[in-house]
């Protein structure tokens, strides 16, 4: 919201940071050098954030409009949430829900750094429809226009980077399926 992609590329170039446009993603750039992202010019001021291009697809597929109300379940650390808010031009309301209070804190920090006041974050059990309704009421949001759910998964698609996942067994996967089903059921009510 604060800086165009072209202006950010110019700023990074001036700081001798190698970066380029990511084709097919209107806001994305790939940074090839420069050290810690948090130390790059503009990061602390909220000029940009870091998100994998694949995660950005969620925002484009959801195609949120300014003024809409969105419920984002399992939202931490908040990358998809803030991208949705940016696509909405900061106009509307997003309730970002996560079970763990410390992870909700990450969402709040992320939204604050990016100056996205349309994001409200709540530590709520997303599998409980009654608790979700209470959370929606707390932020004066009725029925959301859209629901985003990035449900916990087995992570087996990341075996190359996370070899410890090889120890997953059928019981672990069944447990995840039940959790995913509970989240979907609660989101629909």
Q: Can you describe what each PLM-predicted range is?
A:
Residues 1-189:
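S-adenosylmethionine
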């Amino acid at each position: 919201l604060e800086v165009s992609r072209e202006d950010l590329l110019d700023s990074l170039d001036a700081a001798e940071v190698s970066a380029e446009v990511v084709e097919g993603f209107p806001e994305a750039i790939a940074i090839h050098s420069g050290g810690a992202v948090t130390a790059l010019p503009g990061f602390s001021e909220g000029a940009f954030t870091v998100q994998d291009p694949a995660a950005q697809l969620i925002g484009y597929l959801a195609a949120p409009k300014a003024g809409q109300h969105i419920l984002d379940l399992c939202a931490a650390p908040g990358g998809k949430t803030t991208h949705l808010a940016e696509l909405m031009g900061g106009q509307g309301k997003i309730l970002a829900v996560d079970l763990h209070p410390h992870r909700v804190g990450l969402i709040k920090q992320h939204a604050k750094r990016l100056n996205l006041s349309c994001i409200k974050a709540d530590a709520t059990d997303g599998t409980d429809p009654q608790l979700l309704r209470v959370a929606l009421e707390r932020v004066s949001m009725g029925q959301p226009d859209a629901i985003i759910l990035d449900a916990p998964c087995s992570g087996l698609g990341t075996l190359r980077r996370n070899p410890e996942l090889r120890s997953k067994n059928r019981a672990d996967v069944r447990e995840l399926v039940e959790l995913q089903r509970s989240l979907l059921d609660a989101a629909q009510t």
